[in-house]
């Protein structure tokens, strides 16, 4: 693998001086390497995203040696790619989920695991940040939340080699962890910016109200988009649906301050399970005859291909944004190792005490941090709250 990677680095060096020909060589090479990394990951169970990040880090190091150090463009590019990637990953995961009566048990198990492990992680990691490192409250909680979220962007692709039961558990748990983690994060951010306590009757009632509101809005938007799919006669229609979903997500998140990822999740689940989810009494009022298996397969394929493309460039550019000097300091390794010990300790005891199943042992290792952790952690600097100079991007990189 090393020789072609070195060839790829040479093209990265010319990044600042690229003409059209160079760009058309580099971009396909990046996609090809990501595809090869995916194949390697499936055979070795080694996450492909780590290989993508390492490739980006090496590329940055080599370009720096040749005197190119203008990486400011990554500050805006990485969050944009990450947000689109998050939407696509949750959408793809939701489309793959089957909602049937016989799936109820695994859905409940996945939700409870996501909720309980996430909450305990946040509590213990924030206590470590507060009592040992000295981060004030609520800054310690806000920094703990992104680090406590299981990344569906990494967990779902890595679970392909598991037995069906465990694979479904990973999909449900990681997706619910993403959604719950994002809701908790923005809730705590709003409370911290207002200078109010994180736990209280009024703010919790407000949060519950927001959840019900976004569910109602999501159902309404899902119905409209579902009807739109059936009415579009143009041969290109699913990219329009994706564009509308991204628009609705961003409006809900930035302007209405709602957990908009719920919208993406509900739409994906409904689209792939509408025959089971529409009540019998409403089926005669809701048209479904123009949405066939071929349409669903086409949309799923489009989502999967788009996810692969965006994920490739997100993790490559994230790695490219990391200076090699981040690996020199020793303190981030201590903090990161302690956080990981807490997280995997909690996960181990949960699996032993709650699931207590021989087949569930591999699930211990399916608790990665990735895209959503990176996005939320880096976004902390955008808010009017007290920041930390100790728990920074270096600690994030280690974890």
Task: Identify the role of each PLM range.
Residues 12-399:
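Transmembrane helical cores of multi-pass secondary ion antiporters/exchangers
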